[in-house]
Each structure stands twice: as structure tokens, then as C-alpha cells.
Amino acid sequence: MTYVTYLHKPSSIRNAVFCKFVNASSWNVIVAKVNCLEVYSYENNRLCLITSANIFAKIVNVKAFKPVSSPTDHIIVATDSFRYFTLFWDANDNTVSNGIKIQDCSERSLRESQSGPLLLVDPFQRVICLHVYQGLLTIIPIFKSKKRFMTSHNNPSLHDNFSVRIQELNVVDIAMLYNSSRPSLAVLYKDSKSIVHLSTYKINVREQEIDEDDVVCHDIEEGKLIPSENGGVFVFGEMYVYYISKDIQVSKLLLTYPITAFSPSISNDPETGLDSSIYIVADESGMLYKFKALFTDETVSMELEKLGESSIASCLIALPDNHLFVGSHFNNSVLLQLPSITKNNHKLEILQNFVNIAPISDFIIDDDQTGSSIITCSGAYKDGTLRIIRNSINIENVALIEMEGIKDFFSVSFRANYDNYIFLSLICETRAIIVSPEGVFSANHDLSCEESTIFVSTIYGNSQILQITTKEIRLFDGKKLHSWISPMSITCGSSFADNVCVAVAGGLILFFEGITEVGRYQCDTEVSSLCFTEENVVYVGLWSADIIMLTYCQDGISLTHSLKLTDIPRSIVYSQKYGDDGGTLYVSTNNGYVLMFNFQNGQVIEHSLRRNQLGVAPIILKHFDSKEKNAIFALGEKPQLMYYESDKLVITPLSCTEMLNISSYVNPSLGVNMLYCTNSYISLAKMSEIRSLNVQTVSVKGFPRRICSNSLFYFVLCMQLEESIGTQEQRLLSFLRVYEKNTLSEIAHHKFNEYEMVESIILMNDDKRVVVGTGFNFPDQDAPDSGRLMVFEMTSDNNIEMQAEHKVQGSVNTLVLYKHLIVAGINASVCIFEYEHGTMHVRNSIRTPTYTIDISVNQDEIIAADLMKSITVLQFIDDQLIEVARDYHPLWATSVEILSERKYFVTEADGNAVILLRDNVSPQLSDRKKLRWYKKFYLGELINKTRHCTFIEPQDKSLVTPQLLCATVDGSLMIVGDAGMSNTPLLLQLQDNIRKVIPSFGGLSHKEWKEYRGENETSPSDLIDGSLIESILGLREPILNEIVNGGHEGTKLDISVQDLKSIIENLEKLHP
């Protein structure tokens, strides 16, 4: 049975509402992400997540309203199935609760509105208006009588809805107007000649009728409506802003900025502290504007002022204290500070970022020695980025101290139960800091000095501080400072217990007890690094590319072991792993490698050497004291953490990529467990013990469409939108951009011809060349009828060079490698090319039904996904491309991937997914040529790309085997796996019990939500929803017990509650 869960949940925000939802004294922001509502509190100039609610439907709009006698606002949610319901905050249970359960306003005989579903609330809280179908409005009256509100049980906040007809069919936008006598609305629409008009209506709730009003305006620009508190309405067009009302003649303002179109807008609520005459608007290019309207008795003057640039907005929410929330589909959503919004000096400041990786047009899995990373082509237009998603350790900054030039630092606990001393080592000085139990910092002048500090620890039972600088060894007992001054410069040092070891210039290693010398050892070359372990063993790295092991005891110092390396050791750390008699020696080299030698009983375990390349420059190794694991920091171009988990080495990235050095730091009063520094600051931080997904953003010129990679570079196909301010014309330019993996910087690019759009890219088998497919999209053509196949290779001086070019008759929509051949989907055909001796030639081709969208291959099959006609199975036999099977159902495919032999996974534009089977053993030829539908279900999002890959390797006892990874338009990454024959019955029963025991929001059915949705029918779902099953882990014990026992007419499961928790924990290991 197919098992689907989220690796990364949807992050695109298309709708948001600002209201007093949780209590009457504080503000909340509620955002909608596909089928999830997130409730945030607005406190201390930040948005903090309170809770989230998974809705078993796709949310198309959400609005707030305040029922009579309710101290808080309720929200009404409209879904894509033309239904609505309401939610409110239950103060007794501190949770989101159902108000009115699902109400259906669908009419199958009517045509859907071209403007999409519109949900509107009357400013005076009298009615809610829903526009779904052409020529029809659904009116939902809000209770205004307290007596009727108290006696109503079925609909505690709203009356039954009724429908009214309007003449306008092609509606552009609708707005509820400020009219105190009757609920009124303005309708912006197009007539049959595409001329834009505005009409107004008044709603008669008692008679359930709608009457035309006398405020009309003809032949205006198409745009967005914003109601004014003066009773009129603003129309934001492409060139003009109009004001239309009954009292003032039509006024218009010529826009002074080259704006293509206004998208979202917001009228500022007086309670937010902003002038009610000021409106914040955004255009499709991501620019924010302040629009101000000043009214006199008969006229209105309008001003438009640019504020700055932000993410391309899907929704705007004005907040108190000149703050603005920008919800975005194309980039990160942000909380902005708009200082002095009523004055002329504006500066946008980002206060908070909400990561969004939507829309994902393509992605790859990049596997290296540090683990797997997902690299996505995200965003669009100016907001295009590459997003690198890693399963990494998160580091949360608690406090930042601005300081530059830090070389190293140390922390020690001196006669305290916390780390009360911090040493900051700069290039030519050391600053010592004392930290009080309350977290107050003060300087210690006794330990501060005019040279760098190399090492700090405590000796003699924590009674003295040991400080090794470049000139001396110092001991401090809290009052007096004792020192041993070196005749030569000290290059490195270490200690264990009361024993101290330093290396000085000339390759001499000195041993001390305290500051009393007890022995010395002369090396052949200079010492690059050393580490004193608890077995009285010193590991010494030499500039001659050697490591020697010196044993220190009362009888003297002896050389017990040596290792010959190929590179110079630069940093050494020894960590216990096997118990008292063994451990691992970590050695970083000058070229970015980390070597690991396993030792036991003082000897290297044979064949235990492991080499991991973590960069190209020297790496600093630092031991980190953790209660959970013995961890080693590797600080280089990409800071990473190394530790063993279940006898398996784990190398995981860190969320902070600017980290230069670290130190363990335990201080309960500050709530931190580490210090780290960057080029510009020191951070007191808290490192999580649990890995989670972290997203790194790489800026791209333009927006990325396709990506592939080899061991050194990312090859990214980008498109860049250029505008001419004078003519307002736009044109798309295409590029191949090459990014170096370690630095993530662009090192080369190739510009394609005008009107040439990049469509596909693959890496060839030699791991050096890439093949790019394009199509020419000329303005006078509906579809491309020409394109090119090109082969590129990186030169020795890191330039990109075209090696071959082949012109084709159409757009190269998709490319894959099939053995040593190149398979291309070109318009309505599949072609096989061969690249030999710098030329590309056609081996064979075949026609497909309409338009090839995607191709997947295995050893003997080529699967072509069609725009309208599902998939076709092809084989390449004796230089002939032949069709062996086809799905004859109409299906608008978006991606295809081979699940297993003769089993194919297909996604379609409506959010459905189908698994198809090919029967190649049937005696009937017609059966062998016809693909059979095996499983079908609804995913809820449009899938752009599906790949056969695994982000996290499953464990041996995993209940589900991951098979595919799907990327969606709304920024989610879905894992598609197989639950196996033995696990399927239990998981299906568990899913059914959860559906029956846990009440859904709005009374929606999860079973209906996951049903396959065809043209005129729905079919039962063949799916185990991992998100539903995993969501119950945090529920109370009685509810889990009810699920196990089959409450509400469910099936009793043959497991305990503890077994249920273990099952869910097992399933959660598929993703962070």
C-alpha cells in the first residue's frame, strides 16, 4: 500500500487575516497554507506560532468576523469544493474549535467564476458574501440579535445562506462598501467586448434580494478594488487610480511609477494605530507603496509614494507599531518595520523571516560524505532562488556581541557549577571575562594580556586556571598569578588533569606538571598541532605530514606509534568511542580532509582509516561536551558536526554557515550551551540535540527553472525578466549559470539567444558535460516550433564552453539519459540522440499523443508523460523506438517516475496521483498494450517534479520503504513509500480509527479529502496518509487509548498505547 507523508510541509502563503482570535485584548495573524491554518500571536514586534489546524480541504480564502455577544473574532474558511465553515478559539481547552460545520453552496449546473472564489465580509459585520459562480452571489447573514444568538443551537453565529443573481458574468473583483444603512458591494467586471465597468448593489437581507444602486462607472481600467471609509471605492488599475462614489464625481490619479498591475492591498484598521486615509498596496514586481487619499466636501486628492521592495506579495496585513506582514507565494514571507510611514523618509527593515521554498520547479538530491542535501529551484520572477535543504543541527542565537578579529576563545568553570570565565583570543591580545551567576559580564585584568591565548583549562581539581599563550604558561588561583615564560614562541598546547604539554619553535615538545617542567621530546620537524588525551598520550601532528604518538609517564617520554600521511595535519582531536580502552583520532589536513583513526589499547585498529572531504581549505576541529553525544565540530567553509549514532558516523551540517570557531559554554541562567564567533560578532547560543530541516538560500540572477550537478558544480538554467521603463515592455532572457559547490558563488554563465527559453538539462555519463534543451518562443507564435540541443563543458580555467549544437523542430521540454543515449521530449515526439566525437545525431524518434511533458527511464523502458493523454511505455529495440503499452484514459500529467518493474507513478494537474501497471504476460495482445490503473488517490497539491530518491536512509526495522520524492507548486516535499504487505492492514485500521475518534475541523471527511477526483466522479482512495497518523503522537493518553480500542465504532487494534507510540516514532524517522 502507498504511504505518503511530508518531508517539508507547504510553505506558500496565499491568504492571511488579522483579528482578535484567541482573546479580546491581543492581536493574532492567521495564515492559510494549502490545507493548514496557522495561528500566530503578535507580541513584542514578533509573530509567534500558537497552534496549527489541518483542514481536510484546500483553503481558497479565510476572513474574520465578530458574532454578536462573542468576545473574540471567529473566522470563516472557504474551500475549493465550494463549501464553507467557521472556527473559533475555545478558551477553556485552549484550542481551535468548530463553529458552524461545513455548509455546501455548490451548484453543478453553473460555471465557475474566472476571478476565482471571492470571500468578503461587510465592514459593519452584517453579512458575508461568497462569489463562486458566474452571475451568482451567496449571501450569509451574521446574527445581530443577542436574543436569537443565545437561543440558536445549530448556527451559533450565522444565518442560513441564500443566493442572489447579478447581471455581471465576467467579474474582475468585488468589494464590500462602507454603507451604514444597508450592506452594499461594488462589482468590477468586463462586458462582452472586454470593456471594464463598475456597478454597485445593495443587499436586502430580510427579503433575500439584491437591488442595483445608482453608483456606476464605465470604461475604466481593470484592477483591484479597495473600499473607502467615506463610502466610495478605489480602483487600482495599471495606469490610473480611480475613486468612485455617490457624493464625489469620478476622480483619477495618473500613476507616476511604471507599475504593471496592483495585486494585494489592505486598508488600515484604525486600531492598528495608522491613519485611516493611508493604504498600503503592492504590485506584481514586489514594490510596496503608500497610497494616501485626502477628502474635501466635493473632491478627493490622491498620492502614491514608493516605500521599497519586498517579496512579491500574495497578501498584506497592517499591524500596530508601523509593522506590515507580507505573505508571499514566490519568496519568504516577512514581517516588516515601516518607520515614519506618515513622513517622507522610509526604510523597510525585515524583522522576521518565514521560510518559503515555493514554487518548486525542479530539484535534485546531492549526496556527499556529509549526507544528503536537496537543492530546489524555487521562486519566480525577481524572487527566484536556489534553496539548499539539509537535515542539520539547529543553533539558536540567544545573545549577540558585536566584535571583530577574534582568533579563538575558551570557557572554563573555575570554582563554580557553571562556566564563569570566558577568554577571547585576538591576534595580539587576550581579553578575559568573568560571568556572574546572574549572567552579568565584567572584565578580568589579571588574565588579560598582550598576546594570543592558545589553550585554557583548569587543573588541580578545578582550583587553578591554566592559560597557555604564545609566550608563557600561566596559573591563576583567584588571587595570584604564576607563570613560566618560554624562551621560544609557543605554537600549540594542551593538557589533561594536572599534566601540561606545549610545543615551541624548533619542534621541541615540553611536558609540565603545573608549571614545573618534567620532560621534553625533540621532533624532526616543526609541530603543527597536538592533543593530550586521558591515557597520558599525546598525539602530535608534524609539518612533515606525520603523526606521532608520545606516551608520558614517570619513567619518561617514549614514542609508541607513528602514522605517515599524504597531507599536512593541521588540527587534532581525540574522542572516546569504544569505552575506556579505545577511541577515535580526528585529524584535519591542509586540503580540507578529515581523517579518522580508530584506536584500541593504544594501537591503531587495522583498516580503520576513514577519509571525508569536508572542504578544500584547512579545517579547525573542536571537541564539544554534550550530554547526549561525543561530538566534534569541523569548522571550515561549511561548518559541520561529527558524532557516532548507533555505531554509525554521522556528519551533519549546522544551520549557522558563518561560524569560524566554537567553545562549549554551560550557563543555566542564560539558557545556552555554546559560544561561537563569526567575522563580526560573538554569539551565546543554544544547540539543539535533534536534527531538523534547515534551508539555506542562494541568490540567483533571475529565477531558476532546471538544475543538475556533478561533484564540483551546480548547473542551473535561469530566466531573467527585463523591463524597459520607457516602453513598459518585458522580455525574458535565458542563461546557464554555474555555481561552485563549496562557495555557492557563480563562476561562469552562458547567455542564450533572444526569445530562446531554457527547458531542460542533464548531466552526461562522463560527469563533465551537460546537455541543455531549449525552445524559441517568438511573440507571433502560440507554441515553439524550433529549439536547440547543446552540449557544454567546463574548461580548466572555470569557463563554460559550448562543444556541440543541434537544431530541432520544437521545444526540448525534457531530457533523460538512457544508457549512453540522450532521450528528449520535443513537442509531440520522443527522440533518441547520440553524442559522438563532438556531434549530435538522431538515432530514432516516435510521435506521442499531444505534448511530451516528462520522461522516466529504466534498463529497458522509456516512459513518456503526455500533457493530456496520460503516459506511454516505449522500448528501444534494434535502433527502433516502439510503443509497447499506453494508458487510454485522459489525464493531464505533470510528472512520471518508475516505481518498480512495470509499475509507474503519475501525477496530474488537479492534484491526483495514479499508479499504473503493465501486464506483459497476458495472452491477449490488447491487455498487454493497455496500462491498468492499480492505485489512485488525491495528494492535494500540483506536483511539478518527481524523482526516485531517498533523503534519509530507512533503518532495518522501518515500517515503510521510501521510494519517491515529489516537489510541489506550494513548496512542499512529499515522500511516497511502500508500507509493505505485512504492515498495511494495521496502518489502514489505525488510519480508520483516527478518522472516527478525532473530530475534524468543519466536520470535513478525511476519507473524502483523499479520494481521487475525476471529471465527474470521485473514487475511494488507495492511500495511507502518514501526516494524519503522525499527527496523533502528542495527544493525551485517553485519546490514544480510545484509538487503540476502536472507539466510535472503530476496529480494536491488537497493540497497546506504547506500541502505538513506537509505531509513530518509527514512521517519523522517514523525515526530520
Curated annotation (Swiss-Prot):
GO terms for cellular component: Cul4-RING E3 ubiquitin ligase complex; cytosol; Ddb1-Ckn1 complex; Ddb1-Wdr21 complex; nucleolus; nucleus; site of double-strand break. The keyword Nucleus applies. It comes from the Eukaryota. Pfam families: Beta-prop_RSE1_1st, Beta-prop_RSE1_2nd, CPSF_A. Signal peptide: none annotated. The keyword DNA damage applies. It is found in: Nucleus. One of its GO terms (molecular function) is DNA binding. Its main location: nucleus. Keywords: Cell cycle, DNA damage, DNA repair, DNA-binding, Nucleus, Ubl conjugation pathway. Pathway: Protein modification; protein ubiquitination. Component of an E3 ubiquitin-protein ligase that includes cul4. Required for ubiquitination and the subsequent degradation of the DNA replication licensing factor cdt1 and of the ribonucleotide reductase inhibitor spd1. Also required for transcription-coupled nucleotide excision repair. Belongs to the DDB1 family. Interacts with csn1, csn2, cdt2, ckn1, iqw1 and wdr21. This is DNA damage-binding protein 1. It comes from Schizosaccharomyces pombe (strain 972 / ATCC 24843).
